[in-house]
């Protein structure tokens, strides 16, 4: 079709430029960027400027539909087509002689650029090539950009010796022999996080949740993570490195855990960020495992597998339990007769939940919600309050330090907060899967009748918790 023909034509054009440049012994720069950087105004006519310096310019289109180039030695989880093409272009450039160099444009560290730039830099540096990054929108004029490109061009003319190549390094793989390692995980929420330990213990793993983030988390995160990555990622990296540097853990018997959604959110690539930070900090001997559902996990971890068939009922009830407790607390804290009563009840019922989870008795969590509803009713005065919802990136809206305690501030002003809950984040998977299959973006892995059966199972659990919780007079299903 027309699109395939276009891809073929533009790739052949780039290949012709390379052949002709080599015949004439002229330098070539592969100028990579996002699709919108093809607009001359957005890129400030950088491609034209480079050409005026006597250098032939090609784009990452030279590797379009090229199946011979593989990018296996990377930390990055491949998410978007243009990202994958830039990675392949970097790998292709790394294999070429000194007459071909790589320059990448970025604007405002957009989207997953922070992860991508780190990966491209590593690919080139491991193969003894420089990485030139042009942050287009960080300057008021292109004079400084022109100076950087001119410096690269002059170095090409001097044909410097190619640097030595280095092997790809990554953190240790979590093997079957590592099942007894203590697994540390970053803190996320005051609600679900405390219950992770009993859930994991039920599956045979010893997990320890790290303390909530603080100023030192941000400071360490900025030291070891790309400074243009999103704030939650900075905090998570800081928490993990601080823990490993604390001396509290036997590093030969410790592992790190991080969630992985498998979608197009940047959170999917927190794994890459953490591994790179751990290597830079000297903790390459500590394995990293990812937590996800089914095939959404993109990490080699042969020794780590959650027993979903065993833990799913109690894990689902724990999720609904903590979502419900969060609603109870935020409706009560602005109506409590005695200051601190809502927090004490919240903590009480979070502690009570540990034993039913360890004993794999999900029905007891429903019973505790019934008891909690009565106790929360008792501590509340009849009062109408203004109500505000809090939305945002998943870690940001759940983590108090990440959102600078905005929820607590609103509560102190007498405003009832409709808190973020985790359930919708997981339920969207049903909609996403169905639409991806319709658009032929994903193969059908589960028969629809099984998926529908599982959905109805979850829906019944939700209805049960809503009925039970509705005895609390300020509960919103």
Regions found by a protein language model. Give the residues of each.
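An N-terminal assembly and electron-transfer interface module characteristic of large anaerobic redox
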Residues: 1-477
């Amino acid at each position: 079709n027309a699109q395939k023909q276009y891809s073929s034509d533009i790739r052949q054009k780039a290949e012709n430029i390379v052949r002709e440049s080599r015949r004439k012994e002229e330098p070539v720069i592969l100028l990579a960027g996002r699709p919108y950087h093809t607009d001359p105004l957005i890129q400030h006519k950088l491609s034209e400027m480079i050409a005026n310096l006597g250098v032939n310019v090609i784009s990452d289109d030279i590797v379009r539909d090229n199946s011979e180039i593989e990018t296996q030695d990377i930390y990055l989880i491949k998410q978007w087509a243009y990202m994958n093409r830039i990675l392949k272009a970097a790998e292709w450039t790394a294999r070429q002689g000194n007459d071909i160099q790589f320059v990448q444009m970025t604007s405002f560290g957009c989207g997953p650029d922070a992860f991508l730039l780190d990966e491209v830099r590593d690919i080139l540096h491991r193969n003894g090539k420089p990485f030139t990054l042009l942050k287009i929108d960080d300057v008021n004029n292109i004079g400084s950009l022109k100076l950087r490109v001119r410096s690269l061009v002059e170095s090409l003319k001097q044909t410097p010796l190619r640097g030595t190549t280095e092997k790809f390094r990554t953190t240790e793989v979590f093997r079957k022999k590592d099942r007894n390692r203590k697994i540390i995980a970053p803190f996320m929420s005051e609600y679900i996080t405390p219950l992770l330990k009993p859930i994991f213990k039920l599956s045979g793993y010893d997990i320890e949740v790290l303390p909530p983030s603080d100023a030192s988390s941000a400071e360490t995160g900025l030291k070891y993570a790309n400074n243009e990555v999103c704030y939650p990622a900075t905090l998570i990296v800081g928490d993990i490195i601080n823990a490993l540097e604390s001396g509290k853990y036997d590093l030969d018997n410790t592992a790190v855990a991080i969630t992985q959604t498998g979608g197009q959110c940047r959170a999917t690539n927190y794994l890459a960020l953490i591994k790179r930070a751990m290597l830079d900090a000297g903790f390459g001997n500590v394995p990293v495992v990812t937590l996800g559902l089914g095939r959404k996990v993109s990490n080699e971890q042969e020794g780590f597998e959650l027993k979903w068939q065993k833990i799913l009922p109690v894990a689902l009830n724990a999720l609904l339990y903590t979502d419900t407790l969060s609603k109870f607390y935020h409706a009560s804290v602005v109506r409590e007769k005695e200051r601190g009563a809502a927090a004490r009840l919240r903590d009480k019922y979070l502690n009570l939940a540990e034993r039913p989870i360890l004993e794999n008795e999900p029905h007891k969590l429903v019973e505790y919600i019934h008891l909690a509803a009565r106790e929360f009713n008792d501590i509340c005065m009849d009062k109408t309050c203004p109500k505000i919802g809090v939305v945002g990136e998943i870690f940001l809206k759940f983590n108090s330090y990440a959102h600078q305690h905005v929820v607590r501030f609103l509560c102190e002003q007498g405003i009832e907060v409709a808190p973020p809950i985790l359930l919708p984040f997981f339920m969207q998977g049903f909609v996403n899967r169905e639409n991806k299959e319709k658009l032929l973006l994903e193969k059908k892995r589960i028969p629809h009748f099984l998926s529908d059966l599982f959905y109805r199972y979850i829906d019944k659990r939700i209805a049960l918790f809503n009925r039970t919780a509705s005895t609390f007079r300020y509960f919103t299903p």
